[in-house]
C-alpha cells in the first residue's frame, strides 16, 4: 500500500502538540526526528521529555487520505498559519522492514570488537561479537558517541574488571564490556524501557548473569574499575558528583555524548577528581578520559 508522509517543522515547545494534531487528523504513525543532527533528546525523571530544539514531526497517512483537508485543518488551528512549514511526500510501496534491515551492517570497533545485527552473518567468528538489533533504546553503535566508547572499551584490559555503564540505553556498552572479559557490569538508566532492552540484549548474548540493572533511585553504592557514561553534557555536568563516586581508586573514566565546544568545561569539572587525558574526537563529538587520582 502506498503512503503519504507529512513533515512539519517544529521545536521543543510545540513538537508534542503537533504530534497530537497529526494523530487527530488520522495519521497511522507519528515520528520525531532531529532536524539538525543534535543529540537524541534526553528523558528526565518522570514523564517529562525534552525534545530537540529543531524537530521534524512526521505523520504517515494512507495514500487515499484527503491531505488537502488535513492541511486546511492544521492551518486553521495553527497560531500563525503563514509560518507553518510543511512538506508532503509520496512514499513508494515497498517492503519497509526489509529496507530498514538492509541499512544495518556489522560494525568493527578497535581491534577485537564487532557489533552485528542478528540477521547478518558474523564477519569474524573468532572476534568479540556483540549481537544487537536496533530497537527499544538509543545506542546501537551507529552514533559517534557510542562508537567512541566502544573503541575505548576495546582498547582496555577488562579481564575480571568491574564496570559501571551510567545511562546504559540499549546496553551496548555493558554487553561490550562483558564480552571483553569484565566479570560484572552495573547498568543504570532513568528509563525502564532501556533497562528492559538491556536485559533482553544481555540474554541474547548469554551474559545476563553478570549484568545488574538499576533505576537511579535503586542504584547501589559501588566502586568500579571502569566507569563509562555516554549521556549528554548537561547531565554529565549536573551529575558529576554522582558519577565520580562510582570510580574506584585509580579507576578509569570515560565520558561521551559531548560536543567539542562543551568538552573544556567537563574537563575542568572532572579534573577535580581525575587526571584527564586529551579528548578523542569523531566528527563533532568527543570522548573524555581520565583516571581517578
From Swiss-Prot:
Q: Which Pfam families match?
A: PrmA (PF06325)
Q: Which residues bind S-adenosyl-L-methionine?
A: 146, 167, 189, 230
Q: Which residues form a coiled coil?
A: none
**Which InterPro entries does the UniProt entry name for this protein?**
Ribosomal_L11_MeTrfase_PrmA, Ribosomal_PrmA_MeTrfase, SAM-dependent_MTases_sf
EC annotation from Swiss-Prot or TrEMBL? 2.1.1.-
Ordered alphabetically, the record's keywords are:
Cytoplasm, Methyltransferase, S-adenosyl-L-methionine, Transferase
Give one GO biological process term: methylation
Q: Which protein family is it in? A: Belongs to the methyltransferase superfamily. PrmA family.
According to its UniProt entry, the function of this protein is described as: Methylates ribosomal protein L11.
| Name used for this protein in its record | Ribosomal protein L11 methyltransferase
Q: Which organism is it from?
A: Colwellia psychrerythraea (strain 34H / ATCC BAA-681)
Amino acid at each position: 500500500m502506498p503512503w503519504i508522509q507529512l513533515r512539519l517543522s517544529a521545536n521543543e515547545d510545540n513538537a508534542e502538540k503537533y504530534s497530537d494534531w497529526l494523530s487527530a487528523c488520522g495519521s497511522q504513525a507519528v515520528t520525531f526526528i532531529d532536524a539538525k543532527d543534535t543529540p537524541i533528546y534526553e528523558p528526565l525523571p518522570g514523564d517529562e521529555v525534552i525534545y530537540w530544539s529543531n524537530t521534524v514531526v512526521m505523520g504517515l497517512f494512507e495514500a487515499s487520505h484527503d491531505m488537502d483537508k488535513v492541511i486546511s485543518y492544521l492551518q486553521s488551528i495553527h497560531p500563525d498559519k503563514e509560518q507553518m512549514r510543511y512538506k508532503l511526500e509520496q512514499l513508494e510501496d515497498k517492503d519497509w522492514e526489509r529496507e530498514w534491515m538492509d541499512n544495518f551492517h556489522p560494525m568493527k570497533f578497535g581491534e577485537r570488537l564487532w557489533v552485528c545485527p542478528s540477521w547478518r552473518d558474523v564477519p569474524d567468528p573468532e572476534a568479540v561479537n556483540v549481537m544487537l538489533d536496533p530497537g527499544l533504546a538509543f545506542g546501537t553503535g551507529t552514533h559517534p558517541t557510542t562508537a567512541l566508547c566502544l573503541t575505548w572499551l576495546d582498547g582496555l584490559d577488562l579481564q575480571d574488571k568491574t564496570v559501571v555503564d551510567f545511562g546504559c540505553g540499549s546496553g551496548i556498552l555493558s554487553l561490550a564490556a562483558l564480552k571483553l572479559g569484565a566479570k560484572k557490569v552495573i547498568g543504570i538508566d532513568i528509563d525502564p524501557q532501556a533497562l528492559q532492552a538491556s536485559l533482553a540484549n544481555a540474554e541474547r548474548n548469554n551474559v545476563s548473569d553478570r549484568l545488574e540493572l538499576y533505576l537511579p533511585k535503586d542504584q547501589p553504592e559501588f566502586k568500579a574499575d571502569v566507569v563509562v557514561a555516554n549521556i549528554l553534557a548537561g547531565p554529565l555536568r549536573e551529575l558529576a558528583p554522582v558519577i565520580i563516586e562510582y570510580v574506584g581508586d585509580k579507576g578509569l573514566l570515560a565520558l561521551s555524548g559531548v560536543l567539542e565546544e562543551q568538552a573544556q568545561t567537563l574537563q575542568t569539572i572532572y579534573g577535580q577528581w581525575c587526571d584527564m587525558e586529551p579528548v578523542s574526537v569523531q566528527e563533532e563529538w568527543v570522548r573524555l578520559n581520565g583516571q581517578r587520582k
